[in-house]
């Protein structure tokens, strides 16, 4: 079975490592970025199968990053993460 490539964009390093370690034990190849600007660059370089993004990050938040991605890529599934309570 072919591994699924995931781009994880998360500014909290500890959380990013927990998620990465959990998913790498499954059928995923995980690439990480620390903020929306880095995530945007890596997305277009890697063309991952799935994008997992934090909502609130420095330099560019997850919503803005996905808005820019959606200008040219409307197919890649996106999962948003947030630590904010409702």
Task: Put a short name on every predicted segment.
Residues 54, 82:
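Active-site residues of response regulator receiver
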Residues 27-34, 42:
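Short hydrophobic/Thr-rich beta-strand motif most characteristic of the beta2 strand and flanking loop
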Residues 17-25:
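Charged docking surfaces used in two-component/phosphorelay signaling
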Residues 10:
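Conserved acidic carboxylate
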Residues 35-38, 61-64:
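Acidic catalytic/metal-coordinating carboxylates
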Residues 46-52:
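Active-site beta3 strand of CheY-like receiver
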Residues 44-46, 68-75:
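Conserved phosphotransfer cores of two-component systems
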Residues 57:
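Receiver (REC) domain active-site loop signature in two-component systems and cognate sites
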